Each structure stands twice: as C-alpha cells, then as structure tokens.
C-alpha cells in the first residue's frame, strides 16, 4: 500500500503500526521518527516566514473568516506518488490542509485514493484513530496489539501518579500572543500524570486566555508548547511576550518549574 500522511501525528501512527515502508509522502512539518523528513513533502505553509505570534494569529483569523488557505498542497507531487490511502484530519483547519481541499485533490487524481480523516478529541479517541488506521490498512489485530501496549503504559503512569501526595496546579499553554490554553486530550494527559489543569477542558478545543486568568490560577508548573514552533522559536516568543512582566507573580516561575 502507498500511504500519504498529511498530518505529523498521522505519520507517527503509521510508523507505530509498522507501516513506515508504505509511507511515500508527508508534510513539511513531519520530523519523527528519524528519516521521514527525507520523504517527499506535499505541503508548505502560506504564512510569511518570521511572522510573530500575534501576526500569525491575526493572519489565521482573517483567512479562516474568508475560507482562505493556510497551507499549499502540491497536487503534482501527489499525482506522481499515486497514493492508495491519504491520512488527514478534519478537526482543525489551522493544523493541516483543510479536509475539503484534500477531498477535492483526491478526486482529481486518475485513481482516487481512499481518505482516512482522523478527528480525535480525547485520548480514547486517539487510540480509536489507531484502530481505524489498522482497519483500513488491513492489520486490525496488530493495531489492537499496539493499542494494548500503549494502554498499559498509560495505566502504569496513572497508577504511579495516584501515589503522589501533592497534585500540582498546571498551566499548559499552546500559544503566547494571544495566550491559548491547551485542549482536547492534553488536559487529560496532565491529570493522568498527576497534575491539575483547569484552564483547558478535556475534549474541547484550546481557547484564548488573558494573563489575569493565568495569574488567578497560580500555576505551580507551566508547560509552553507553541503549536508549530521548535524550542528556540518558542523561547524567542516568550522573551517578547506581552505578559512576561506578570511572570514574577506565578509560583511556577518562582520555583523554576517552567
């Protein structure tokens, strides 16, 4: 089978199921596991290079209002790769090529490939996404084995975290200007690991915050995971954040747990 992944997490899922040799194309953001970046890239961003967090936010909001694209899909390369299956998502048009664009592209190919849309909002649904991928690729039993291994790992973490005497208040931030909480399964992961996350909601999208909400929450641990940014870029954005003056008021900063 010839598989094209239009989502970094889907690329990892394909490999988790042992189907890496079937992968023929990925996105410009796929970088794990090692070696996938050598595969043909089928996407590129339409956002200007070097734009700040606030500038990116404005551009994204404007384009979503007008149904404008955030990514470009290389139709010619897609045609050359002749995929049997395209794995994508319809959960968030900010995170990847819009599902409607993928559907139109697939229909334009000489041999229309199957499309698998992944839309998990909770950890259980992430495992269901693996199950769907295993089913469509003809290895449902192996997918169940992989899910079993992952489930046992989660159970081990939960079991150990229950022994923690103090559960720390956590702020998990997905964007800095404006501030965004975490969402979907991330608050769930924090709770499973022994933290308390109340700025984001399990199964719900991330939402905009203001610094007063963060200060009122008084987080003892802060995770910063800006969507699409690597560590150096995240640190750069943090140093220029409008809320940096509020940091001394946060317990997590005082204890160095950021």
Region spans (language model):
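N-terminal ligand-binding lobe of clamshell/alpha-beta domains
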Residues: 1-258
